[in-house]
Amino acid sequence: MSFQHRQIEKKWQDYWEDNKTFKTDTFSNKEKFYALDMFPYPSGQGLHVGHPEGYTATDILARMKRMQGYEVMHPMGWDAFGLPAEQYAIDTGNSPAEFTNQNINTFKRQIKELGFSYDWDREINTTDPNYYKWTQWIFKKLYENDLAYMDEVAVNWCPALGTVLANEEVIDGKSERGGHPVIRKPMKQWMLKITAYADRLLEDLNELDWPDSLKEMQRNWIGRSEGAEVTFSIKGNEGTFTVFTTRPDTLFGATYAVVAPEHPLVKEITTLSQKEAVQNYLDEIQTKSDLERTDLAKDKTGVFTGAYAINPVNGEEMPIWVADYVLMSYGTGAIMAVPAHDERDYEFANTFGLPIKEVVAGGNIDDEAYTGDGEHVNSEFLNGLGKEEAITKMIDWLEANGSGEKKITYRLRDWLFARQRYWGEPIPIIHWEDGTMTAVPDEDLPLTLPQVAEIKPSGTGESPLANNTDWVNVVDPETGLKGRRETNTMPQWAGSCWYFLRYIDPNNTERLADPKALEEWLPIDIYIGGAEHAVLHLLYARFWHKFLFDIGVVSTKEPFQKLYNQGMILGEGNEKMSKSKGNVVNPDDIIDSHGADTLRLYEMFMGPLDASVAWSTNGLDGSRRFLDRVWRLYVGDDGSLTDKIIDDESTELDKIYHETVKKVTDDFEHMHFNTGISQMMVFINECYKANKIPKIYAEGFVKLLSPVAPHLSEEIWQKLGHSESISKATWPAYDESKLVEDEVEVVLQIMGKVRSKIQVPVDISKDDLEKAALDDESMQKWLEGKTIRKVIVVPGKLVNIVAN
């Protein structure tokens, strides 16, 4: 008989909600365990089967830890600001807030139907003014500590749409919507000085229990480089420019310089004869993204400015070019080109007929750039030296001659913290007519978004908020000074930088969260989510956390002690699930046909949690069959317990039961859920073979199953005679003495060749083992007509007989 999943699941979901079964006591005396999911963006599509994979993993840990006596924090909320809701509002004329709330309701229903043990009293929503009041407060603190500033930054400007576009909205230089031309245009933007934390973000990675691959991605993103900054003067011009290089030892081989098209020097140094060519080039590359500009495979383009730099080390003139492969946002926006020893410079020099001078021996520069190590040549005081020695000597020379200095630089850029959008947190800053800026006072937070009838582009590059003059224009009541509110809003990353702190104290109106509560619960014990957030979200959250640590809000340097990335669930043919391929699996359908417990079990059993695995309907059916077998083992056709479960002590399942408790506990702790479930299946097979199942083992098994299949387990637990939820029960313990084998298999050999195997007691003596080997029927056949010369006995392993 199959269990009725629809009735059982609804019954227990209602029970948990009515009884607040999973409510967390913030100041409990128990040991704390904080299990966190990456909260979702509530899209219009609803939940997909990828979401429950990570959520089930944290839920298993949360449920097990509760039963092990921990106070567990396991919350859920909504990362609800974002572009899709604004786009929907522009397209339909409806409110993004209403659209977002509808989506949240769908997500919440779906998540509740999966039976996750969330404390819904801690639910947060990043678009709730009571929440973003504190996002604004953190921004204010960053501003007060000189970590938020305004700067001119090139953005993707679409004149036809009258708006700034995010990188992901631009495809091949055109807007994703409508295919209009997009150009790069400098605009004043808010920046956060994440670079001030670069070293700490790098060093503290060593203290975290994170996957090595993920730590490496963050290290590469921060990209610490040691080298030198070199200053070049310009022939016939007062100006200078600096370049950063990791190879100052190759300065004698620098034969030309390249500056980014956006470099302020370009206008200053371009000669009259080159002005037109330079302007044409600047117009031509306006539509290219940074990614296109730095593509190694693309043909090199550039134009000569007509100006020359002076190489400080040998006084030689170097032509200054403008080329799009140099970015203003990286380094100083200018490079010294050493074409003999850099592939990109070599290609550029060959394209434009620029000189190539060897300064490191070992290659053939007529054929290609030599990027290996070797002795320095054509380098005066560096000749004959190796790389490291030459770098040190050149830096000493640069510093002694006032031409440069040792420098550490980072690939990490400051964080562009502004979006020209309506649907985001308003930035709490006022720009006054006298050119000053002030932050909105704390007592006026939250600065809420104004209600608008429709969202339309401002046409000026400002956000749609600029259209709302009543909201934008302000007057200082004390001085009469006129001002304008900041019209940019925060990026979607803002709310997710600190949401895990608010869960700890979600209704506090006086402060971000109670410091004592934060101290109780931080750092987070386990954070599970997709690897696509490896860099941005996790780096930004670490940056904000370190800042909050510095100003005394939190007491830990890092927010997430242990982090785990779940893999991706692919379509049946090993392809990514997508609507266009028609291979998307909707969890609602599975919950209806197979049940939430089956979906949870299957997603944990389909493979290792961190692997990408293809969805299989057969696998799903197999998971349901296993749960049906469990049900039939416990529950008869009349709905009562089967006769197989007895109160007596029977020993036939001793070993397999204690093995199962040990393996499931260990595997769940280490997030090897698939092998833990596999062991449960082995146990159920043994139960079917056994004559009787002691009730204590029957109960122990249901406890082990309950984190994976909670609804079914609650129902069986009730049938076993319990009135309280199984989540209040104690996690089973195993007895080491029951795991010990009382018998062992011994290999029997003649002249080193295996001829038989026997089972013997573990504590058998050497003499008895020798006798048992000689008495074995198979051995007697092999020994017939032979003389035994020697018997070698290795207790617990083998007996080898030398005979001829």
UniProtKB/Swiss-Prot annotation:
UniProt-annotated binding residues for ATP: K579
Cellular component aspect of the GO annotation: cytosol
First-listed, main subcellular location of the protein, grouped into a coarse class: cytoplasm
Motif ('HIGH' region): 40-51
Entries under Gene3D superfamilies matching the protein: 3.10.20.590, HUPs, Isoleucyl-tRNA Synthetase, Domain 1
CDD domains attached to this UniProt entry: Anticodon_Ia_Leu_BEm (cd07958), LeuRS_core (cd00812)
Keywords: Aminoacyl-tRNA synthetase, ATP-binding, Cytoplasm, Ligase, Nucleotide-binding, Protein biosynthesis
Pfam families linked: Anticodon_1, tRNA-synt_1, tRNA-synt_1_2, tRNA-synt_1g
Any one GO molecular-function label of the UniProt entry: leucine-tRNA ligase activity
Domain of life: Bacteria
Motif ('KMSKS' region): 576-580
GO BP: any one term: leucyl-tRNA aminoacylation
Catalysed reactions, as listed in the record: tRNA(Leu) + L-leucine + ATP = L-leucyl-tRNA(Leu) + AMP + diphosphate
EC number annotated for this UniProt entry: 6.1.1.4
Disulfide bonds: none
Localisation: Cytoplasm
Family under the similarity heading: Belongs to the class-I aminoacyl-tRNA synthetase family.
NCBIfam families on file: leuS_bact
The name this protein goes by in its record: Leucine--tRNA ligase
Organism: Oceanobacillus iheyensis (strain DSM 14371 / CIP 107618 / JCM 11309 / KCTC 3954 / HTE831)
Gene giving rise to this polypeptide: leuS
